[in-house]
A protein has these predicted regions:
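N-terminal leader/targeting and pre-domain segments
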Residues: 26-344, 348
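C-terminal "tail" modules appended to repeat-scaffold proteins
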Residues: 338, 359-362
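Bacterial N-terminal signal peptides
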Residues: 8-21
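N-terminal secretory signal peptides that target proteins for export/translocation
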Residues: 1-6
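Alpha-helical transmembrane segments
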Residues: 349-360
Length: 362
């Protein structure tokens, strides 16, 4: 009998511990923090990680309330929510400059011309973190800009519909790291004054940063571009990192200007990649990158040299007119003249498709 007592004691302890553990799980509940309605201040709603999908949908935030807050100049602070409906930034009021008295006719004409450009303002911070956005985000004004004066933070958020924030000016840093864009993500002619954080972000069928300007650093380490990725004619004043990034379809950096470090180490380009006429004013790193299809570096300018000898090229890259490159180190093996012509023709056809597609979308 005595030999059984320790076992019974251990069993009793195990049951008690199990009960305690079970109680702890039962006590973990969905918590919701929100700002009271009808009062000034940010539109705030935070749902804890313990909330179920049903609980998040029951506490969904309508897009209309977000647009109302932005129209009133209030900040938006949403964490762990479901956002239902479209955010159409073209609905924000247009800001016009008052024309003071006493100006010359020339000054009045210049100010009137500025007022012809539509300018919309988002005054407060916009935070939508670890959330699900079911509707679209749109700014499609063809003759105006959308200016975000505060921070924009979309960390870990899933966008189920398209995002088009083209012709936007971001005065503070933009954070979209670990976000998921299931459809298109357009930031055409954007201006990023403090840079872009997009590490480990998954982009969908089409991503466009065409002619965007980045004054601050760009960190897209480990990002996945599932579809076409356009960085044509971008200007990057600060270091840029696409280290370990994955590019699934055609990728265009043609005409880009990298004034500081451009890091493409360990990146994988599964389809055609275009770096024609790119200016690398700073260090260009491509060590251990992989180009599995055609790569076009023609007329690129490596002002501080290149490390393309450390790159895996499945096809010999095009380097006609390229400056600052060790020609003998670019690519492994060689192709016949017919193969080179075939590669050139294929790249030109893909480039023509990208241009036609871009014109169609404008």
């Amino acid at each position: 009998m005595n030999t059984m007592r320790p076992c019974g004691f251990v069993l009793l302890c195990a049951l008690l511990m199990g009960g305690l553990c079970h109680t702890g799980v039962a006590e973990a509940a969905c918590t919701v923090e929100f700002s009271p309605g009808g009062k000034p201040g940010p539109l705030m709603k935070h749902l804890s990680p313990d909330c179920t999908k049903a609980e998040r949908e029951a506490n969904a935030v309508p897009a209309a309330s977000v647009m109302q807050a932005l129209t009133q100049g209030r900040a938006v602070d949403l964490v762990g929510v479901v956002l239902q409906g479209d955010l159409i930034f073209d609905q924000l009021p247009v800001r016009k400059s008052q024309i003071p008295k006493g100006l010359t006719p020339e000054q009045q004409a210049a100010l009137s011309a500025l007022n012809d450009e539509e300018q919309r303002i988002v005054a407060g911070n916009v935070t939508i973190r670890d959330s699900v956005v079911e509707g679209a985000l749109r700014h499609r004004s063809a003759k105006g800009t959308l200016e975000f004066e505060g921070t924009v933070d979309f960390h870990g958020t899933r966008f189920k519909d398209g995002v088009d924030l083209s012709r936007s000016v971001f005065q503070r840093v933009v954070t979209i790291d670990s976000a998921l864009f299931e459809r298109e993500a357009y930031f055409v002619q954007g201006h990023f004054a403090q840079g872009l954080r997009c590490a480990d972000t998954k982009f969908g069928p089409h991503t466009r940063f065409h002619r965007s300007v980045f004054r601050g650093p760009v960190d897209c380490q480990g990002s996945l571009f599932d579809g076409m990725a356009e960085f044509l004619e971008v200007v990057c004043d600060a270091p840029v990192s696409f280290e370990r990034a994955r590019f699934g379809l055609g990728t265009g950096f043609s005409g880009a200007q990298f004034k500081k470090l451009a890091n493409f180490s360990d990146a994988i380009f599964s389809r055609e990649a275009f770096f024609a006429f790119v200016v690398f004013s700073g260090e260009a790193r491509f060590a251990d990158a992989q180009f599995l299809q055609a790569a076009d570096f023609s007329n690129a300018d490596f002002k501080r040299g290149d490390d393309l000898a450390k790159v895996r090229f499945d096809q010999k890259p095009l380097t006609n007119g390229t400056k600052g490159i060790a020609q003998e180190g670019a690519g492994k093996g060689g192709q016949s003249t017919f193969q080179q012509y075939a590669i050139t023709l294929g790249i030109l056809l893909v480039a023509a498709f990208l241009v036609a597609y871009a014109v169609k979308l404008k």
